[in-house]
Amino acid sequence: MVFALDTTLSFPDPHLGEADGLLAVGGDLSVDRMLLAYSYGIFPWYSFRYNREILWYCPMQRFVIFPSEVHVSHSMRSLMSRGTYHVTFNQEFDEVIRHCSRLRIKEDGAWLGVDMVKAYRKMHEQGFAASVEVWQSDRLVGGLYGVTIGRCFFGESMFSSVPSASKLALIHLAHYMNDNGGLLIDCQFETPHLRSMGGRFIAYDDYLKIIQQE
């Protein structure tokens, strides 16, 4: 079942959503609503080419990476040891999301439009969204961004302008989280790229227990 949201700051029980995870339509992208959504594993998907409605998803099987389980291939270890790139955190959030937005606009069904970018920038300004940047000398060549609540990271998008830069960003994020008590990276959707790095499915109820830990 798909629910229509109004101005009330609430969401229906995620267990009542459609088989593909679609739970609700409408509402807004305010920081308060976004924080409430992510605290239950609900995330927005905005197919702005085809409609102006915000779609809210909450799949019952969650594709995640546990920081301690991230897989670093031999080729990635070699790349990291060469020192060609360096990685920073939260130095260029706006640039990372701009690159991700440009990439998504080229894709069919692009979702990262102006309203979404503004929403995540507001979350970053209030300390609820973060970025990882990959640099080659002084040139930004890759990165990712997502929402941070508690000890969990909800990945939203990544980009690479050179091979493996987004993988490098994700590896550094996982290592940082593992060293600092991070619990889980929510990947939202399965991809071969993420599965090769240690991603796996867990049931929503198990996922919810993790993301709501203090």
Q: Each predicted region: which residue ranges?
A:
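N-acyltransferase acceptor-side catalytic subdomain
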Residues: 1-214
